[in-house]
Curated annotation (Swiss-Prot):
'KMSKS' region, short sequence motif: residues: 266-270
Top-level class of the enzyme under EC nomenclature: ligase
Residues recorded as bearing Phosphoserine in the entry: S270
Official protein name in the record: Cysteine--tRNA ligase
Keyword Chaperone: no
Gene3D superfamilies documented for this protein: Cysteine-tRNA ligase, C-terminal anti-codon recognition domain (1.20.120.1910), HUPs (3.40.50.620)
Family: Belongs to the class-I aminoacyl-tRNA synthetase family.
Catalytic activity: tRNA(Cys) + L-cysteine + ATP = L-cysteinyl-tRNA(Cys) + AMP + diphosphate
Organism: Bacillus velezensis (strain DSM 23117 / BGSC 10A6 / LMG 26770 / FZB42) (Bacillus amyloliquefaciens subsp. plantarum)
GO BP, one annotated term: cysteinyl-tRNA aminoacylation
Chain positions recorded as ATP binding sites: K269
Gene name of the encoded protein: cysS
Length: 466
């Protein structure tokens, strides 16, 4: 089955057909690195990491690029407040970003370009827009001529007239039209700046992504993604800049994830109700936060509260328990049982259902429902008097398959004392029955979990390894 995805540009689901067969060029707007990331920043990182995983699962060669905005007004303000320079602050929070999203199971992009490392490409892009008549210089600033680009407003589905009615020129701005936006900003006293044909300054926010997409992925890409709040003006302006320069369709598909609400109220730094990722993962398993995010379709809003996270924890633990039980059941399984094919067929049905869910606009919520149903079937199977090891392994393999796409590792939980004693008793029984193969298998399993056994005249003793 082919993938269908919801394209913000057309406001409908479309069959995914990449520009080049078998290959996907994907760009995701990354964070402005002036502080630790909050859960709103984490959502696109998790969502689009999962999208990449599934595209690769389907056999696509994905070139995934996600940027860092390492210079802008917020960073300059943060650096001034901390008494540090902008590069020091941005480097600190880039490192923190990788630590946080890494804990959440996100792989690094193929490239993480930074604005300060791509100033030449940005200046060249702006210069070309001026030459083509789409931009103009005004007292050291450079602005994009919004009205010169006929397609402006197509992503956010707003007309120029609608936009004009609410546009104003602020005091100090040197643009010709209220709808024009800055490509380059003249330097202010004491601010970090770069030499340019228009004097010292720094780039506007929107031009950064256009320039880096062109440099690292080319004139046209398959997927451009980010948070819903970036649709306008950021992504709208990216389209205008890039398509004005190249005359080509900038991005074929636009994906946008929904907002996060805190206790039913929109998360906002101005309201002070934001939650930092590095605070949450001190209290909870980082995988739980990822599971929580993926339990809702990426385009829908998420309501976050610790109460909801606790409920999600209970659900997540049910999957982990089923996975743990499957691994333990391998010890006592036989080679063949009477109805193996029936159970294997059920597992295959769940593979199909999982792929159907993900093919439908990357519906991780439905995919997780399939996972729970698979766990339910596995639990039924383990109630059988006899289980076949190849069927158990097929269940485990399907758990792993789903987990690898969703970026979730159920793993083996640390055994509690009662479980260890139970396994030791099974081993003792195997030894009494002279089933030394099973005895060794249990010993090796415990050893892999860092449980050390010592057989003495008084019985088997155990301890946890250092």
């Amino acid at each position: 089955m082919t993938i269908t995805l919801y394209n913000t540009l057309t406001r409908k689901k479309e069959t995914f057909v990449p520009l080049e067969e078998g290959k996907v060029k994907m760009y995701v707007c990354g964070p402005t690195v002036y502080n630790y990331i909050h859960i709103g920043n984490a959502r696109p990182a998790i969502v689009y990491d999962t999208v990449r995983n599934y595209l690769e699962y389907k056999g696509y060669d994905v070139q995934y690029v996600s940027n860092f905005t390492d210079v802008d007004d917020k960073l300059i303000k943060a650096a001034n407040e901390l008494g540090e320079d902008v590069p020091t602050v941005s480097e600190r929070f880039i490192k923190a970003y990788f630590e946080d999203v890494g804990a959440l199971g996100c792989r690094k992009a193929d490239l993480h370009p930074r604005v300060m490392e791509n100033m030449d490409a940005i200046i060249e892009f702006v210069s070309e827009l001026i030459k083509k008549g789409y931009a103009y210089e005004s007292e050291g600033d450079v602005y994009f001529k919004t009205r010169a680009f006929e397609g402006y407003g197509k992503l956010s589905q707003q007309s120029i007239d609608e936009l004009r009615s609410g546009a104003r020129i602020r005091v100090g701005e040197k643009k010709e039209d209220a709808l024009d936006f800055a490509l380059w900003k003249a330097a202010k006293d004491g601010e970090i700046s770069w030499d340019s044909p228009w004097g010292k300054g720094r780039p506007g926010w929107h031009i950064e992504c256009s320039a880096m997409v062109k440099k690292y992925l080319g004139d046209e890409i398959d997927i451009h993604a980010g948070g819903q709040d970036l649709t306008f003006p950021h992504h709208e302006n990216e389209i205008a800049q890039s398509e004005a320069l190249t005359g080509k369709t900038f991005a074929k598909y636009w994906l946008h994830n929904g907002y996060i609400n805190i206790d039913n109220e929109k998360m906002s730094k101005s309201l002070g109700n934001f939650v930092l990722v590095h605070d949450i993962i001190k209290q909870y398993d980082p995988q739980l936060l990822r599971f929580f995010m993926l339990s809702v379709h990426y385009r829908h809003p998420i309501n976050y509260s610790e109460e909801l996270l606790e409920k999600t924890k209970n659900a997540f633990n049910r999957l982990k328990t089923a996975y743990s039980n499957l691994n333990h059941r391998l010890i006592s399984s036989t080679n063949l049982t009477d109805n193996d094919e029936e159970w294997l067929a059920k597992i295959e049905e769940h593979r199909t259902a999982f792929e159907e869910a993900m093919d439908d606009d990357f519906n991780t919520a439905n995919a997780i429902s399939v996972w729970f149903d698979l766990a339910k079937v596995a639990n039924y199977y383990m109630q059988e008097d006899n289980t076949a090891d190849h069927v158990i392994k097929a269940f485990i393999s399907m758990f792993d398959r789903i987990g690898s796409v969703l970026g979730l590792t159920l793993g083996e939980e640390e055994l509690v004392d009662e479980e260890i004693e139970e396994l030791i008793e099974k081993r003792n029984e195997a030894r009494r029955n002279r089933d030394f193969a099973l005895s060794d298998q249990i010993r090796d399993q415990l050893k892999s979990m860092n449980i050390i056994l010592e057989d003495t005249a008084q019985g088997t003793r155990w301890k946890r390894g250092e």
